[in-house]
Swiss-Prot record:
Annotated glycine binding sites: 226
Binding site for NAD(+): 36, 55-56, 63, 126, 152-154, 216
GO MF, any single term: iron ion binding
A Pfam family assignment: Thi4
Catalytic activity: hydrogen sulfide + glycine + NAD(+) = ADP-5-ethyl-4-methylthiazole-2-carboxylate + nicotinamide + 3 H2O + H(+)
Positions of Fe cation binding: 154, 169
Family to which this protein belongs: Belongs to the THI4 family.
Keyword flag Transcription: no
Protein name per UniProt: Thiamine thiazole synthase
Function noted in UniProt: Involved in the biosynthesis of the thiazole moiety of thiamine. Catalyzes the conversion of NAD and glycine to adenosine diphosphate 5-(2-hydroxyethyl)-4-methylthiazole-2-carboxylate (ADT), an adenylated thiazole intermediate, using free sulfide as a source of sulfur.
Keywords for this protein: Iron, Metal-binding, NAD, Thiamine biosynthesis, Transferase
Length: 250
């Protein structure tokens, strides 16, 4: 084996552990690297907050990539045009709506969030939250494959002033509190894009002290309808949760 093989390994290990060590105490831990989570990460990081996103899958981006039924295009409301210009995502305006290539959109959000300073930990699952004095104060993390395989391996804890559940339809983080009777959780209702886009933004916010909910998780928690491959509500929800947290941290 050449010394270069060892060098490659050492550089990866050193850089990753530096990144992890610097993320053990955060302003905001975002769970789920979908559209609302990445938008919130971008907005918070560009304003100087220490933000990390924990994504249990290998591929961040949530439900963006597949567009509608694997037709890799998505739709947004016209009001998102300024945001797309800000993050330099290309789009077309058709019939008073915005159409975007879903692969371009997902990769653009990922680039902007990480460029702004957010750290994305893919293949890392949040298996629990830390609660002290009646308030969520961090996340309990383990390797995604470890959790999926049910291996008996203890996790580690990351401290965070606020935690955002951006895990989409399952609302995984809120579910952890609901099964212990700490919060009430409803269920997602059938498709209604018009109502859902408004519902998800209106109901974005704190569900338990220190824990906020954004994106499709809002519909699962509060009993809102789903909306399919229109993503304006996801972006607006991510922006709203970032504003709420920013105001609380200042």
């Amino acid at each position: 084996m050449s010394m270069r093989d060892v060098l490659i390994s050492r550089l990866i290990v050193e850089r990753y552990f530096e990144k992890l060590r610097n993320s053990l105490e955060l302003d905001v831990a975002i769970v789920g690297a979908g559209p609302s989570g990445l938008t919130a990460a971008y907005e918070l990081a560009k304003n100087g907050f220490r933000v990390a996103v924990f994504e249990e899958r290998n591929t961040p981006g949530g439900g963006i990539w597949g567009g509608g039924m694997m037709f890799n295009e998505i739709v947004l409301e016209k009001e998102l045009e300024n945001f797309l210009k800000e993050v330099e995502i290309e789009y077309e305006v058709k019939e008073d709506h915005i159409v975007v290539d879903s692969v371009h959109f997902a990769s653009g959000l990922l680039y902007r969030a990480t460029k702004a300073g957010a750290i994305v930990f893919n293949n890392v699952s949040v298996e629990d939250v830390a609660v002290q004095n009646g308030r969520v104060c961090g996340v309990v993390v383990n390797w995604g494959p470890t959790v999926r395989l049910g291996l008996h391996v203890d996790p580690i804890t990351v401290k965070a002033s606020f935690v955002v559940d951006g895990t989409g339809h399952p609302a995984n983080v809120v579910s952890l509190l609901a099964k212990r009777g700490l919060v009430e959780m409803k269920t997602e209702f059938p498709m209604d894009a018009d109502e859902a886009e408004k519902f998800v933004v209106d109901n974005t916010g704190e569900i338990f002290p220190g824990l906020l909910v954004s994106g499709m998780a809002v519909c699962a928690v509060h009993g809102g309808p789903r909306m399919g491959p229109i993503f304006g509500g996801m972006i607006l929800s991510g922006q709203k949760v970032a504003r709420i947290v920013s105001e609380r941290l200042r």
